Amino acid sequence: FYAVATNIQTGEEMVFGRGNAGKAVRASCSIPGIFQPVNIGDKYYVDGGVVNPLAVDVARRYGADVVIAVDISSSFETAAPTGTVETIMRAIDIMYNKMAAIQFKNADVVIKPKVGHIGSSDFTKRHEAIMEGERAAVEAMPAINQIIAKLKQEGRLP
């Protein structure tokens, strides 16, 4: 398991692969302006998405032969944000979408649940998001099975 966070003091990407996994996960999803940076050692970390929203390159660097990514891009065809938090979240979503689009091209399979209408701060629709994620994963199974068959044919899987 690896978690990607951003050193808020230097702007550098940090990949956590050992140590306190709970702190690493907390740091990797600590959205700036919404959650406090997480102190690990003598450094402070925030959401890894600030510098690398999808981290396909990190997965490859750490040995992944196959990368399955999930596109949770937001739809911007909704009403304008009404408050400070909504505005911050929309700005983060826009940055995420632009940077993630580059990484999606490097993934082997991209699962695309239709959750763009659910805001990243809208926890009331989590069940809907989970169900849509399951539907999209099932839809992606033919592509995943194709990769599995190829790996078996190459002798890389039993």
What feature does the model see in each segment?
Residues 1-158:
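Patatin-like phospholipase
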